[in-house]
């Protein structure tokens, strides 16, 4: 998982959804650099089925370097924003740096991309992987609709545009950004065969880093 914002929350939500079906290890906190990532991989046990890891960067080439440490089957990009602008100088360079996570994926692997962020959506053209998208956009594979967010949490409908299946999600995380993070988690869960309803239940009780 990488992105300018939302990496840690998305990682936590993904791990919660996958844990309904698999033995999961995840990055603790936001240990997402060349030191923290190997620490996470060292926590993998013989019975671990999926590792959910967060990848951060401070410049071009760093995500690629982390990908050499952790060969991934699914890559998630949450968004491209102005974080690290002082290091990379332009949104295009930030997108290039984040996009390194999908560039080497094969046709057997999956890129999960935010359909609402133009820089992330454009990464679909830079990968050989199968592309699954999420967001509010009508073209998103997993689309959020009927979103209500209050001081107590968020309620929304997730629609799988391929099957038309819908599920209601009621979770204790506030803000539309967390709805997007949840949609990413549901999308990743679906890639691994987790039912939408099971992901919705997991999100109801998921714990986010720092909360």
For each feature predicted by the language model, list its residue ranges.
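Adenine nucleotide phosphate-binding catalytic loops in nucleotide-utilizing enzymes
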Residues: 91-92, 125, 129-211
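Phosphate-binding loop of NTP-binding sites
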Residues: 1-115, 121-127, 165, 183, ...
């Amino acid at each position: 998982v990488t992105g300018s914002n939302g990496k840690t929350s998305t990682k936590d939500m993904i791990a919660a959804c996958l844990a309904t079906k698999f033995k999961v290890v995840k990055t603790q906190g936001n240990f997402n650099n060349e030191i923290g990532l190997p620490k996470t991989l060292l926590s993998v046990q013989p019975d671990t089925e999926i590792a959910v890891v967060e990848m951060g960067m401070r410049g071009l080439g760093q995500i690629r370097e982390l990908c050499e440490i952790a060969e991934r089957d699914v890559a998630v990009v949450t968004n491209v924003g102005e974080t690290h602008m002082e290091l990379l100088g332009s949104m295009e360079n930030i997108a290039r740096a984040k996009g390194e996570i999908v560039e080497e994926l094969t046709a057997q692997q999956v890129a999960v991309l935010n359909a609402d962020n133009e820089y992330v959506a454009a990464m679909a053209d830079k990968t050989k992987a199968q592309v699954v998208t999420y967001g509010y956009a009508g073209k998103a594979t997993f689309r959020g609709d009927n979103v209500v967010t209050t001081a107590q949490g968020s309620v929304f409908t997730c629609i799988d545009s391929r099957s038309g299946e819908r599920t209601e999600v009621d979770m204790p995380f506030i803000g539309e950004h967390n709805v997007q993070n949840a949609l990413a988690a549901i999308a990743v869960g679906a890639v691994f065969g987790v039912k939408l309803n099971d992901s919705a239940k997991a999100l109801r009780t998921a714990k986010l880093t720092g909360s």
